[in-house]
């Protein structure tokens, strides 16, 4: 899984934030672009844990070690597929999730944890940029209407299939 010594070879590095005075004037991304080689290095930091506590710390049970490995290897399209295997809305969770997975990261016991949230966001951004992620509206319309009352984001994922009817 990944680079065997990646967690020793690379330090945690986050994409820099845009200046606040610039951000208050627009709705653009908070973080600046991050070069692919740095993203791959962050994916390489993921250790081959016997028990991936990051995965159990994730509310949607993302296959975090798997897609971190795919990032390290530069296999972005497969990473998109792997991410969507457990998460209907990675474009949201990669931005607004408080990332309990990072708090559960085994590397975090002795060093700063893997940049899981940043990696997730960049997988989904790459998927949209490359055209691998596209809307999938239903080809058959019944004419019926569905109302979904959501108390919070946690209820969106199980109801997402209803939105394609």
Show which residues each predicted segment covers.
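Ferredoxin-type iron-sulfur electron-transfer modules and their immediate structural context
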Residues: 1-145
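N-terminal Rossmann-like FAD-binding beta1-loop-alpha1 element of flavoenzymes
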Residues: 141-165
């Amino acid at each position: 899984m990944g680079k065997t010594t990646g967690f020793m070879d690379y330090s945690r590095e986050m994409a820099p934030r845009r200046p606040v005075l610039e951000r208050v004037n627009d709705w653009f991304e908070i973080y600046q672009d991050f070069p692919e080689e740095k993203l791959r290095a962050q994916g390489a930091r993921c250790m081959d844990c016997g028990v991936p506590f990051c995965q159990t710390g994730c509310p949607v049970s993302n296959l975090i070690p798997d897609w971190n490995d795919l990032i390290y290897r530069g296999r972005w399209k497969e990473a998109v597929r792997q991410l969507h295997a457990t998460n209907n809305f990675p474009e949201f969770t990669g931005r607004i999730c408080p990332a309990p997975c990072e708090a559960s990261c085994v590397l975090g016991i002795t060093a700063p944890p893997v940049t899981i949230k940043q990696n997730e966001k960049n997988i989904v951004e790459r998927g949209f940029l490359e055209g691998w992620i596209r809307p999938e509206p239903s080809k058959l319309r019944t004419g019926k209407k569905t109302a979904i009352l959501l108390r919070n984001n946690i209820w969106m994922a199980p109801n997402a299939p209803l939105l394609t009817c």
